[in-house]
């Protein structure tokens, strides 16, 4: 049978709602998440805008400063010629302090290096055979003399023979200046003209280079590598320095004496040689003044009249009115003139004592 209207109307009436389904819950949760994301995005955008505003102001200030600096540099470049290469950095206070600190350290290093070098050169000056209280060897002369000294000693050790003094001194003075050569000669108690024949072109060829007018004194320089007993064993005050007779050797031996020889105006014997005297860098040997031979005449004896109270026989000889007599002692009766043999004996004795003990 057919249904009634009432029944069909009941179908169109709203039915009571039941509990929400799981789909509704999912949709609501998604909406909440979308809203939270939107809020976060809005906050981030606001923060970014604020940062951009702040940074924009700073960047604008920096840009303005850079533009001003560029304008100043352009003005300076217009005034000054352009320099090639890297541009010089602006000197700040920190860079200036670092620069000063580096310079101070470099100066201290250089000062210490020079102090060490000078101390080493002073020690070397004490070792080389050249010493003077008034003069000081330069650095280059000290190194040259040390090189020559090492070479001479190595040659002696290699050959195993006692060297000739003249050749030894010539090796020491090779390449040195004249003042340094004079200092070495003064240390060895030699005259530079005796071992430098090239400085005397007028010297006769038959004469030896070493003359007896300047005999070799004992080698007073003490070296750490050589024995000490031979040095200073001879006393120069006991050695007579005999000059040759003027009439026989005056012209030939004039180059070897400090002053030219004159006829019978100097005594036959001179006192010992004093240490070399330095005058403007030139060393020369000077005889010490002797009270016995100060006069031009030799061995003159004066007797005052007050002390001659004796017999009449003596009074006739030593009278007060008469001139003082001259008592000359011949040289031949005292010592024969054997200059070269004496010089060679002294050299050989000293060298043998040094290198064979």
UniProtKB/Swiss-Prot annotation:
The recorded induction information for this protein reads: Up-regulated by fentanyl. Down-regulated by miR-190.
**Keyword Nucleotide-binding in record:** no
What Gene Ontology cellular component terms go with this record?
Answer: cytoplasm; nucleus; RNA polymerase II transcription regulator complex
Where is this chain primarily localised?
cytoplasm
What the entry lists under InterPro entries is as follows: bHLH_dom, bHLH_transcription_factors, HLH_DNA-bd_sf, NeuroD_DUF, TF_bHLH_NeuroD
The UniProt function text for this chain reads: Acts as a transcriptional activator: mediates transcriptional activation by binding to E box-containing promoter consensus core sequences 5'-CANNTG-3'. Associates with the p300/CBP transcription coactivator complex to stimulate transcription of the secretin gene as well as the gene encoding the cyclin-dependent kinase inhibitor CDKN1A.
Protein name per the record:
Neurogenic differentiation factor 1
Taxonomic classification = Eukaryota, Metazoa, Chordata, Craniata, Vertebrata
């Amino acid at each position: 049978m057919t249904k009634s209207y009432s029944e069909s109307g009941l179908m169109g009436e709203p039915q009571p709602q039941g509990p929400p389904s799981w789909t509704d819950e999912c949709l609501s949760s998604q909406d909440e998440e979308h809203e939270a994301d939107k809020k976060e995005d809005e906050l981030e955008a606001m923060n970014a805008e604020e940062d951009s505003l702040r940074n924009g102001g700073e960047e604008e200030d920096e840009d303005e400063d850079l533009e001003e600096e560029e304008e100043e540099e352009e003005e300076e470049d217009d005034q000054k010629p352009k320099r090639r290469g890297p541009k010089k950095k602006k000197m700040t206070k920190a860079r200036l302090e670092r620069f000063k600190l580096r310079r101070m350290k470099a100066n201290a290093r250089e000062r210490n290096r020079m102090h060490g070098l000078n101390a080493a050169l002073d020690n070397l000056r004490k070792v080389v055979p050249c010493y003077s209280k008034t003069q000081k060897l330069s650095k280059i002369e000290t190194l040259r003399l040390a090189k020559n000294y090492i070479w001479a000693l190595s040659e002696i050790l290699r050959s195993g023979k006692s060297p000739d003094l003249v050749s030894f001194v010539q090796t020491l003075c090779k390449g040195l200046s004249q003042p340094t050569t004079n200092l070495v000669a003064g240390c060895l108690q030699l005259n530079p003209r005796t071992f430098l024949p090239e400085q005397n072109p007028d010297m006769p060829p038959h004469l030896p280079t070493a003359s007896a007018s300047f005999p070799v004194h004992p080698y007073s320089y003490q070296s750490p590598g050589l024995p000490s007993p031979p040095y200073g064993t001879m006393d120069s005050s006991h050695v007579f320095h005999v000059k040759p007779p003027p009439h026989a050797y005056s012209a030939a031996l004039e180059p070897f004496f400090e002053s030219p020889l004159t006829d019978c105006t100097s005594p036959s014997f001179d006192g010992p040689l004093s240490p070399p005297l330095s005058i403007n860098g030139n060393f020369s040997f000077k005889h010490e003044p002797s009270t016995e031979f100060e006069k031009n005449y030799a061995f003159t004896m004066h007797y005052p009249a007050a002390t001659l109270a004796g017999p009449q026989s003596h009074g006739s000889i030593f009278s007060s009115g008469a001139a003082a007599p001259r008592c000359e002692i011949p040289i031949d009766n005292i010592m024969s003139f054997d200059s070269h043999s004496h010089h060679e004996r002294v050299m050989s004795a000293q060298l043998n004592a040094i290198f064979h003990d």
